[in-house]
Amino acid sequence: MLAWQDGGAKAAPSHHKISFSVLDILDPQKFTRAALPAVRPAPREARKSLAEVEAGKDASSRDPVRQLETPDAAGPGAGQASPLEGSEAEEEEDAEDPRRPRLRERAARLLPGLARSPDAPAGALASGEPCEDGGGGPVRSPPGSPGSPRPRRRRLEPNCAKPRRARTAFTYEQLVALENKFRATRYLSVCERLNLALSLSLTETQVKIWFQNRRTKWKKQNPGADGAAQVGGGAPQPGAAGGGGGGGSGGSPGPPGTGALHFQTFPSYSAANVLFPSAASFPLTAAAPGSPFAPFLGPSYLTPFYAPRL
């Protein structure tokens, strides 16, 4: 009797077959068996795949597909011993295995989001989809990676600066006319600039910029000449214009015959004359008998206005 039991105990491991193929290791069907008693470790713990270990121990509780496959694992008999491999119960489980892929496919169709989530790597492997957090699965590049198109746009942004203004190509006739005008005067008035632009078929801005550049070039070629010209060519003093008609050497030239018309002469602008103008300096007084305004204005009317007041 003891010999028969020893022989049966020794013959039992002969039915145990270990498969080292990748499909058998990654097959989720072999992860659903309950734990054996202390005689040997549970097949589920012994045959865990690398993807399930990385996913974590709580993947089985979050995966609805695995809960459908193992309704007896959460039942009251979960702690009981599972039948030995090679027994009739195991053969019945192997006979029912072809139905489980259909259940998994059906569950994957009903719950596509959970099947594709990284919390269910076993269901993703069973349905043939690549696992994102697995070791060999393809990993999607983040949006900020160098391969994405957004960094390319950012690289092109510094190059997309404000376009530079095109330089004006002046013709030979335009350059000659501009040079002749610059020799005549280095600063143009508004009317001169407008007339010159219309005559040369240019805009006022083009003429103004050309004169600015030409003045800058001239100042570099003749340093200090512009300041000396301004000091030497100052305007004459207004007080030097009095006296002998319009032909004086120090005054501004006047029209011919101004000496005969005494009412066109201008007095000197001194402080006393501005504050207290004298009646003799104005030709409109009644003392001048040859004045054209004498018949219209009497002496009693003009004298109080032009008499000095203290």
Swiss-Prot record:
Positions with biased composition (Pro residues): 140-149
Biased composition (Low complexity): 109-118
Listed GO CC annotations: chromatin; nucleus
Gene3D superfamilies recorded: Homeodomain-like
Main location: nucleus
Chain spans, region Disordered: 36-165, 217-260
Keyword Transcription regulation among UniProt keywords: no
InterPro entries cross-referenced by the UniProt entry: HD (IPR001356), HD_metazoa (IPR020479), Homeobox_CS (IPR017970), Homeobox_NK-like (IPR050394), Homeodomain-like_sf (IPR009057)
PROSITE patterns: HOMEOBOX_1 (PS00027), HOMEOBOX_2 (PS50071)
DNA-binding region: 163-222
Keywords assigned: Developmental protein, DNA-binding, Homeobox, Nucleus
Subcellular location: Nucleus; Nucleus, Nucleolus
Compositionally biased tracts (Basic and acidic residues): 42-66, 97-108
Domain of life: Eukaryota
Ranges of biased composition (kind: Gly residues): 230-252
SUPFAM superfamilies: Homeodomain-like (SSF46689)
Biased composition (Acidic residues): 87-96
BP GO terms, sorted: cell differentiation; regulation of transcription by RNA polymerase II
Family of this protein: Belongs to the NK-1 homeobox family.
Functional note: Transcriptional repressor. May play a role in early development as a Wnt/beta-catenin effector, hence controlling pluripotency and preimplantation development of embryonic stem cells. May promote adipogenesis in mesenchymal stem cells, possibly by inhibiting the expression of the antiadipogenic factor NR2F2. May inhibit osteoblastogenic differentiation.
Subunit structure as annotated in this protein's UniProt entry: Interacts (via the homeodomain) with HIPK1, HIPK2, and HIPK3.
Name of this chain's protein: NK1 transcription factor-related protein 2
Annotated organism of origin: Homo sapiens
